[in-house]
Amino acid sequence: MSSNIEPQTTAKCILYTTKGNIAIELWAKECPETCKRFLSMLSDGTFTNGEFKELKPTQWLMFNANSTGEYRTVAEEKNPRIRFNRDGLLGWDRRRNTWFITVLADSKHVLNDCNVFGKIVGKSIYIFREILGGEIEASSRDNDVKRFMYPAVLKDVEITIPFFEDIFGSKRRLEDNEKKEQEPAKKLVKSAKVKMVYEDEQEDDDGDVQKLKPRKRMILPAWIKDDSRSEGIKLDASLDQPQEALIREKTELHDNVDEATTKETESQENIKEEPMDKRERETLAMLSKFQERIKNKNILK
């Protein structure tokens, strides 16, 4: 029978296993007692930490709960539109009071005494098939029933649509390690800035500034201190001397200039007042006689 004639599902839940998450939808309206039993045992933690341990390759993957509690046997619920006609369907084993998931496409001929009440939806079918591919133990209780060496474990459940009024929707209870992963990362505290502060700078009032330790100074002997002090006194005295020397030098230079100017003036006056000597007079006389001789004569012939 094709799945397009199946009735609409009315309840939903998510199984969180160690191999991945499996989304399940239930026909709570068509199989009310079976679906209510399944959701009740999920919500009260009966199935928590149970294992998908046993596999019958021709029929089902059985869920093995640690305890089924004191629940009475579920009544038989049949619907002509819902049948075991493919893999990934949920069935209830009324004799063992637990549930399973079908493996083969058509196993209705061996599951007539079980109630079909739900199905795996979406991409969860690939998680289910991955569970089926787990490693099988070498020895088994029965030749037909195999046991997984590392079975998938049901760690938590989430009922998203309970359908029944006395069953409330539940959110997933996170494990401790998952809570740590989902905790928001703490903001990194910025480290205080380090600023170099020198002795000749004013202190900074910024609270984030950390001052460096003052540098160590060398302690000089007493005799070096005395010499440095005396040299400092001499240096201070010598700082005033250049100004006095400059003033004195300017005054002396001015006096020397005035004295030189006076001497030059006096020498010029003495030159004007001195009479011509004998040789100069003789030279002038000879020049006068020469001029008289050549007067009116053409000496260029």
From Swiss-Prot:
EC top class named in words: isomerase
Record text on subunit structure and interactions: Belongs to the CWC complex (or CEF1-associated complex), a spliceosome subcomplex composed of the U2, U5 and U6 snRNAs and at least BUD13, BUD31, BRR2, CDC40, CEF1, CLF1, CUS1, CWC2, CWC15, CWC21, CWC22, CWC23, CWC24, CWC25, CWC27, ECM2, HSH155, IST3, ISY1, LEA1, MSL1, NTC20, PRP8, PRP9, PRP11, PRP19, PRP21, PRP22, PRP45, PRP46, SLU7, SMB1, SMD1, SMD2, SMD3, SMX2, SMX3, SNT309, SNU114, SPP2, SYF1, SYF2, RSE1 and YJU2.
Spans annotated as Disordered: 251-280
Stored InterPro entries: Cyclophilin-like_dom_sf, Cyclophilin-type_PPIase_dom, Cyclophilin_A-like
Family label: Belongs to the cyclophilin-type PPIase family. CWC27 subfamily.
Sequence ranges assigned to domain PPIase cyclophilin-type in this UniProt record: 9-159
Function comment: PPIases accelerate the folding of proteins. Catalyzes the cis-trans isomerization of proline imidic peptide bonds in oligopeptides. Involved in pre-mRNA splicing.
Membrane-crossing segments per the record: none
UniProt name for this protein: Peptidyl-prolyl isomerase CWC27
Gene3D superfamilies tied to this protein: Cyclophilin-like
Highest taxon of the lineage: Eukaryota
Record-level GO BP terms: mRNA splicing, via spliceosome; protein folding
Pfam families for this protein: Pro_isomerase
Localization of this protein: Cytoplasm; Nucleus
Record-listed E.C. numbers: 5.2.1.8
Keyword annotations of the record: Cytoplasm, Isomerase, mRNA processing, mRNA splicing, Nucleus, Rotamase, Spliceosome
Organism the protein comes from: Saccharomyces cerevisiae (strain ATCC 204508 / S288c) (Baker's yeast)
Molecular-function GO terms, alphabetical: peptidyl-prolyl cis-trans isomerase activity
Additional detail: Present with 2360 molecules/cell in log phase SD medium.
Disulfide bonds: none
GO CC terms, sorted: catalytic step 2 spliceosome; cytoplasm; Prp19 complex; U2-type spliceosomal complex
